[in-house]
Structures are given as C-alpha cells and as structure tokens.
Amino acid sequence: MYEDEAWLNCHPDDLWIFDKLIVAKKLGYICGPVGVDVPKPGKYIVRPCVNIMGMGQGASFEYLTEDTDALTKHNVYTNNHVKLGYFWCEVFEGRHLSVDYKTNPNQRSLKQGLTVEGFRSKNNPLWKFDKWVRINEYVKFPKVLYALQGKYDCINCEFIGDKLIEVHLRPNHDIDDFNEAIPVWNDELIIPPENYIYVEDKDYNRIGFFKR
C-alpha cells in the first residue's frame, strides 16, 4: 500500500495524521500555519501541511523573523514568506528513524517491525538521503496514536531524535528484506558497488536503490 491508497482507506476521524501541522500541534510543538507569526526570529523547518507525494518534497529550513504572510498587499512574495498550504515548526536535532508497527486489530495487539535509520549529508536538501540502514532498536509507539479509530495493518512513524514528525498508514517499502538501501538519484550511474544489487524504484528525483 502507498500513501494515496492509505488516504483513501483511512477512517475519516483519523485523517488528521496526514496533516503534519495538526500532528505537530497535537504533540505540543512550536508551530503554526502560514499567516501565524513565529514566536521569535530563528531557523524553522517549513513544509507543506499535507504531502501525499512524500519524499520530503517542498520541505526546507528557513530563517523567519516575524510574520509569515505568504503575500504582501501587492501580491508580491517577500523574503520572509511561507507559501500558502505550508506551515512552520521548530527544528529538532537527532537521528532520523523510520519505524513500522505491525498491528492486529482483532487481537488488539501491536508489534514493532522494520526499523531503519536514515543518513543525510548536512548540505543535502531534506529529500536527499545518502542511505537507510536497518537497526535493531526498541522505539516506543507514540501515545497520541492509540486514539486512532480505524483498523490498519501497519502504522509507520518517522522520528527526529525522540520527536514524532510524520505518520503513515502503510509500511516502509524502501528497504524491503535488505539491511541497507542507498538511493540512486537522477543522472547517477546504476552500476552497484561490490556486494550490492541495483533495484529500480522511481520516485521524486530518484531512479532506484543499491541494496544489500
């Protein structure tokens, strides 16, 4: 299942999990939509509230000083704008983890499954990861998600440090049964390094993975 299917199959009362601003607000983060002033000047992460396309598209770090109105009265973008449909949030530091939680609604059980850590060079855009590595590490299921009304086979959560930043009602498909996945981006060679295989998997600016 992919994100568009997950949205279609989502219980109406659970659709808030697709809106990252609502997720952030429920978790008590410092955040707000376009048009709401930031509490103090500083670096914030700016993202679309809803991004069904995934891959961190549209996300960036921005220095915001006060108001975040998207347009001036002359309909001209300012240097301090946040686009309509976007939101700003405080920046978190730490490891980027993606965790699948397998659920059995009939038995009301929950089990942690695939857990991977993402690595991204500091100067890369937020969508451009260097690799994903399977890890064996316990990550507690977020308390806020126990209130979900629908029945889902898998709930995927992404964390920065211990902060939940995204929720998906489908599994992580990138690494499959492998232990490591290196994204191969547009215009890069598809000749795999030693002990890796190339797997075509096209998405935003990506043509596949080297996996092992």
Predicted regions and their residues:
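ATP-dependent carboxylate activation and anion-phosphoryl transfer catalytic cores
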Residues: 55, 92, 107-109, 120-212
